[in-house]
From Swiss-Prot:
Organism for this UniProt entry: Escherichia coli O1:K1 / APEC
Name the UniProt record assigns to this protein: Cysteine/O-acetylserine efflux protein
Assigned keywords, A-Z: Amino-acid transport, Cell inner membrane, Cell membrane, Membrane, Transmembrane, Transmembrane helix, Transport
PANTHER family: ARGININE EXPORTER PROTEIN ARGO, ARGININE EXPORTER PROTEIN ARGO-RELATED
Gene (name only): eamB
Taxonomic lineage of the native organism: Bacteria, Pseudomonadati, Pseudomonadota, Gammaproteobacteria, Enterobacterales
Family: Belongs to the Rht family.
Intervals, Cytoplasmic compartment: 29-46, 91-104, 163-176
This protein's GO CC annotations: plasma membrane
GO MF, any single term: amino acid transmembrane transporter activity
Its job: Exporter of O-acetylserine (OAS) and cysteine.
């Protein structure tokens, strides 16, 4: 990879990993509501699911030049529906001030989110088809970069969770408002899938 292409790769992957999306918003919400330690299951589920999705993206990108538009469209609708459901769960979740103790979303729910998370699927397919496959078609490189993409995504999730933990007091004081803003951001993510 040339220095210019490498620079573009890092810019794309870091910006994509650090911008709001279903994973980052869920990580922030979970750490704000339950603390960083109790959110580790959520982060672990996201990380494992992210890695598997990146490896699947590698397989798809490696074997197909163009993804069937009908499959992408169906996946987009499924992803949008799940994201809107997640937004509803966050918007209606009780805050500490409500006096109810709730558990963070489960490992398996955060794991399952990855398979309908259009943002990370497009992230993986775009990074691989734009930056890797034009340079090399060595399977080891494609798989290696897929693992790197998952690590970069996990880094973004952890950063958002740490922000939720560090600003927990402030977020708890304005918990209801934060939940509504996060839910609206998720709805925005769902709408952006189509526009």
């Amino acid at each position: 990879m040339t220095p210019t292409l490498l620079s573009a790769f890092w810019t794309y992957t870091l910006i994509t990993a650090m911008t709001p999306g279903p994973n980052n918003i869920l990580a922030l919400s979970s750490a704000t509501s339950h603390g960083f330690r109790q959110s580790t299951r959520v982060l672990a589920g996201m990380s494992l699911g992210f890695l598997i999705v990146m490896l699947l993206c590698a397989g798809i990108s490696f074997s197909l030049a163009v993804i069937d538009p009908a499959a992408v469209h169906l996946l987009s609708w499924a992803g949008a529906a799940y994201i809107v459901w997640l937004a509803w769960k966050i918007a209606t979740s009780p805050t500490k001030e409500d006096g109810l103790q709730t558990k963070p979303i489960s490992f398996w729910a955060s794991f399952a989110l990855q398979f309908v998370n259009v943002k990370i699927i497009l992230y993986g397919v775009t990074a691989l088809s734009t930056f890797v496959l034009p340079q090399t078609q060595a399977l080891s490189w494609v798989v290696g970069v897929s693992v790197l993409l998952a690590m970069i995504g996990t880094f973004g999730n952890v950063c958002w969770a740490l922000a939720g933990h560090l600003f927990q007091r402030l977020f708890r004081q304005y918990g209801r408002q934060l939940n509504i803003v996060l839910a609206l951001l998720l709805v925005y993510c769902a709408v952006r899938i189509f526009y």
